[in-house]
Amino acid sequence: MASPASPRARVRALLQGQGDGRGIAVPQAHRLAARIQERDWDEFSCDPTQLANGLRDLADAINPDGVAVCLPDVLLEGGRDILTSEQGQAALEATRRLKASMGERVALVACLPGPSLLDSGIDGLLEAGKAFLAAGVHALVILGDDADDGPSVSLSTLANIARFHQAPTVGVPASLGLPAVELVPFDAPHPASGLVLTETHLPRETDVSELEDWVDTVRG
């Protein structure tokens, strides 16, 4: 019997439309990771060592298919120029370390804010996406808002660059013109397919066993 495909291989298969029909579970859970590490949030989010260790411990605890190396709300805590902030720099370095230490065990996913939330707009998003791809992420997720009112050439450029790295680019809302990522509520999980995130960034006090159940359910 063939061995099950690794999370990295499952993500890569999405590029060819050859997904296995099961969910690739990626919880938004940095605050929980900080609690697992027993770290203060402000230090955790700006320290690449704490961030990498916390996300690795989170993966050990809940066995997800993917780890979100950055989240929009966390990146924006440092301002709208996300690559120059302490949070952005910490996330990039943590990505490099996780890439080296975790191999194919989990897919590394960069969840980035939509262009309307960034000082440099679409150009800022393009540069951020390129930086995280160079650091080693396996997928990009753009979590925009209603102000992101249409697809652009730059988003197509970003998706093409990501494809060169064998990384899919997905996002919400649909107006971004990207393949959709599924957002599943933590308190109402259901089997899903493709890349699947918790609907929101989970609070620090989230129960680890309940999150493990969420992962198992959306994976199907």
Predicted regions and their residues:
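Active-site-proximal, glycine-rich beta->alpha crossover segments in alpha/beta enzymes
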Residues: N53, L76-A135
